[in-house]
Design a protein with these regions (language model features):
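Conserved RNA-binding domains used in RNP assembly and mRNA/RNA metabolism
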Residues: 2-94
């Protein structure tokens, strides 16, 4: 099943909580987003979201995935295709 799914590194932005306690308004206004890096098989991609899955298991006839994440497309900064032959699939997935 996964032979046709590209292995990718996704760089994306996420919300970041501030520390508890009192802080100056100036310091609060300087807060930044967290930059995240996630790897896995690119399972789905459209204009609103991408889904990557990090783990895959086969046992008898069961095929299951784990550690998947759905990321809003607007949060994605970059998608790097990790295997040379997957770079050709880049055009298929955006």
């Amino acid at each position: 099943m996964l032979m046709n799914k590209p292995l990718v590194l996704v760089t994306w932005l996420d919300a970041k909580d501030g520390q508890t306690g009192w802080h100056s308004i100036e310091d609060i206004q300087k807060e930044r987003l967290a930059t995240c890096h996630s790897t896995g098989w690119l399972m789905y991609k459209d204009e609103t979201k991408i889904i990557i899955m990090a783990d895959y298991s086969e046992f008898d006839d069961d095929k299951e995935g784990g550690r998947h994440i759905t990321i809003p497309s607007g949060w994605v900064q970059n998608i790097t295709y990790l295997k040379e032959d997957d770079k050709e699939k880049q055009n298929e997935h955006g």
